[in-house]
Amino acid sequence: MAGFRWFWDAMGGKNTRNQTKSKNIVAQAAKRGVQFASLSDADVVARAHECAQHSDDESRADLLALLSIGAQRSLSMNPFNVQLQAVLRILEGDVIHMATGEGKTLVGAMASVGYALQGKRVHSITVNDYLAERDAEWMGDLVRYFGLTVSAVTESLNTEQRRRAYASSIVYAPVTEIGFDVLRDQLVTQRSHAVQNGADVAIVDEADSVLIDEALVPLVLAGNEPGTAPAGRITEIVRRLKENEHYSVDADRRNVSLNDKGAALLEQVLGIQSLYDDAHIGTTLVQVNLALHAQALLIRDVHYIIRDGKIALIDASKGRVAQLQRWPDGVQAAVEAKEGLVVTEGGRILDTLTLQSLMGRYPIVCGMTGTAVEATDQLRQFYDLRVSVIEPHKQSQRFDEADRVYATQAEKFRALVKEIELLHTTGQPVLIGTSDVSESEELAQALQARDITVNVLNAKNDAEEAQIIAEAGDIGRVTVSTQMAGRGTDIRLGGANEKDRDAVVAKGGLAVIGSSRHRSSRLDNQLRGRAGRQGDPGLSLFFVSLEDDVVVVGGAGEEIKALPDADGRIDSKRITDFVAHCQRVTEGQLLEIHSQTWKYNKLLADQRVIIDERRARLLDTDQAWVELSEAVPEKAHKLSDKLDPAILVQAAREVMLYHLDRCWSDHLALMDHVRESIHLRTIARETPLDEYHRIAVREFKQLAQRAVDLAVETFRDVTIDQDGAHLADAGLTRPSATWTYMVSDNPLSNNNRSVINGIGSIFR
């Protein structure tokens, strides 16, 4: 992608586009603010409504001035010029790059009000429930000052509460809750049962995380229907297998392969002739693969924890429990069996939606993050979004030390502990970012053994994160945390109340240490950005070993020679450059996976739009009755003679919607199955993506007619009376229970291709 950037830069797609003009508008807003200061509240609101309807420079300047006055009067907050500049760029549809601690929450609220004053419905999208509730409450007075309404949607709300919340002018909500509500609304058979009423604008906090890192994560709506899981006996047998003797794991530990000796042992114990016979290849072998992958690749306290007797997945990019997430391919059940837990029931996937497709439902998408510049290419490629860099209110005083590279992880760990101990003796607060729960606990134990009190923030105690982070800048504080992305609490020097601020400043501010480099430089910078908030002093430093994942994966196939000192440290610019190269390679791999997956998902997303439009017509008009009465006129005439038209329209609607929803679910299952096996088509010298698209188009054309044909057949035979269509009597029932979850990245994939009978197994 780096080679592509020069092209669009030359075409005018600069990160800092229009910033001179924006600064001039902000300067004009400051002058207008003085003139507007004497206006009454009613006049401020009326003038803001008027200015919001226009997009010329003068109106924009006036609107910024009036929004600033509103913030002062309602929140006692006086926005800096850089915050007004950020508001302006969001109102122009950009993603803003704004450093941690620069006041993005106020910026997002002011921009939301600016859009809402135009008559647009705004969804202010957060990464979790805590931030949605916090921001809606914190910024609520500003919204209400301008005569608008505000609400928060969280997991705890019931259907009626959600419906009321979505009716607000501005809605704060986690992206997952919005997506799940979209999916649930796609099952309603009466418009009044839907909770959402659409929105015009999505303002996305942590935009790179939502729009890039999690863009292709499917949100799933499932119904109760048995799925496939490994039998208990198979789990016990697989537990006996030994790595390198019965199976092998590839270098990056993403794939595991059963060898002949392992297969022979399983066949002997199970009493079967061959795992690869037709009778077993789609059943027993699938279960063996599931159990083996769960046993060999998924590690407790790295990929998941056990909480309240249930598996809780860990979001690697955030270091916290991934709420409502589960694995695909029956892996979830396999891990539950491995850990001796109750195996959860599988289900039929009724509908699915990626976050990228969800964002496509909004006419306007914009946002803010502290690491937008690093995601510029992806935001441009996948969303046609531009990045505007907002300079900090005060220049950063943070010192970014060069990486300390060690030969082995053991040597790196010893040096890391020694450095933390040294900093702690000075009283300087230290925040250490680790890659997973297991590492955070190991590091905490090593520090505690040296009589250092440690606060640990990881997926096991993420409910306490706000308090732990708020105190991380206190004098002498040592905090160990898995990932800092999406943790919205600021770290203030001297503690939450800044009582010892001067003392901490004198000691150099907050020291942030990364225990390794991540596969994306954005994640490194999210951690680094916690130090040096609003011109504070600070320090950032990363420890790296040549055994770290980013080096092993990014440097695969390359030989590197180095001479470590007695402590294992390699002080060489050549090695430091090599580590940076490895990170760029892994970033390129992630981007390629995203790009390829997007190409597969794009056609299904387009087909979904057609299904949504068809469903809306059936839901909002009498189209279903018109089509069915034309197809079966005799029955339609008889029913019309004795039943109210409203009953007939609703009965026809339910018949049509049932078969449309069912056929769409079947289509998703089929295309997932096609995608799992599409790589085999390269053997026949066919292009996998082209073949996938050919099949998807062909099957979708058949879907439309099949749904209508089935509906006509049902309409002809089903009983329709005063109580409507008796679909249940005809064996046509919707699931009695549904649930939602996110499909975590499949840990058992190679080039984004499942090596076992994938998510389609849940459908069948």
From Swiss-Prot:
It is found in: Cell membrane; Cytoplasm. Keywords: ATP-binding, Cell membrane, Cytoplasm, Membrane, Nucleotide-binding, Protein transport, Translocase, Translocation, Transport. Its main location: membrane. It is a peripheral membrane protein. SMART domains: SecA_DEAD, SecA_PP_bind. It catalyses: ATP + H2O + cellular proteinSide 1 = ADP + phosphate + cellular proteinSide 2. Its EC number is 7.4.2.8. InterPro entries: Helicase_ATP-bd (IPR014001), Helicase_C-like (IPR001650), P-loop_NTPase (IPR027417), SecA (IPR000185), SecA_Actinobact-type (IPR026389), SecA_CS (IPR020937), SecA_DEAD (IPR011115), SecA_motor_DEAD (IPR014018). It comes from the Bacteria. HAMAP family: SecA. This is Protein translocase subunit SecA 2. It comes from Corynebacterium diphtheriae (strain ATCC 700971 / NCTC 13129 / Biotype gravis).
